[in-house]
């Protein structure tokens, strides 16, 4: 799932301007990294990496990275995201939880939310697993949740794009139906892009029929963090 993105020469030049500052905090926790990068560097590097990963690599990961604020506000946001990530991991151990920048990259694979072949409807097990996440999402209401749907490689490109959009939408509508605010959500479908397993076995194809989340601070959380809250 991890990929190396080749940045443009301009992006590399800008990124190198902040290499020393970033290197000094590379071993820090995510809260410390939010402060150590700094406001300007956080916004610039977050924008560059988020934009490039979103176009040429994992979209959810790029969205989570691209939301960087940096500075003291970034540290406060990072602390809240650290706590939320731990609670998600405890609530649903079958999910893959990754803290990136000032956001959370969450993969709900076949162990958490499974989709049958050519289906976008949620299975009873998928609903039960989503139910485990709802209390955490409600506790951290000042976050935006972007949902990305995916398919395996079977079928035509346009069909898979539509199917992946429907999968993301199914998850969104289920969560809204459980009381989460619709304004927090955005959905996208990426079809066969960003596979996390080979598509040459039934097991691998099942893993690729998934949804991923990018959980980031909303405007209120950002403003609260800037106010030191």
In which residue ranges do the predicted regions lie?
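Bacterial N-terminal signal peptides that target proteins for export
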Residues: 1-9
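C-terminal motif of bacterial Sec signal peptides marking the signal peptidase cleavage site
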Residues: 17-21
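Short, low-complexity, glycine-enriched hydrophobic/amphipathic alpha-helices that associate
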Residues: 23-87
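Amphipathic, membrane-active segments
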Residues: 81-112
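Solvent-exposed, polar/charged alpha-helical surfaces in well-ordered, non-transmembrane soluble domains
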Residues: 86, 90, 124, 128-135, ...
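Short, solvent-exposed beta-strand/turn patches at coil↔beta or beta↔helix junctions
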Residues: 101-131, 151-158
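Periplasmic peptidoglycan-binding/anchoring modules of Gram-negative envelope and division proteins
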Residues: 117-149, 176, 206-208, 213, ...
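Periplasmic OmpA-like peptidoglycan-binding domain that tethers envelope proteins to the cell wall
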Residues: 150-224
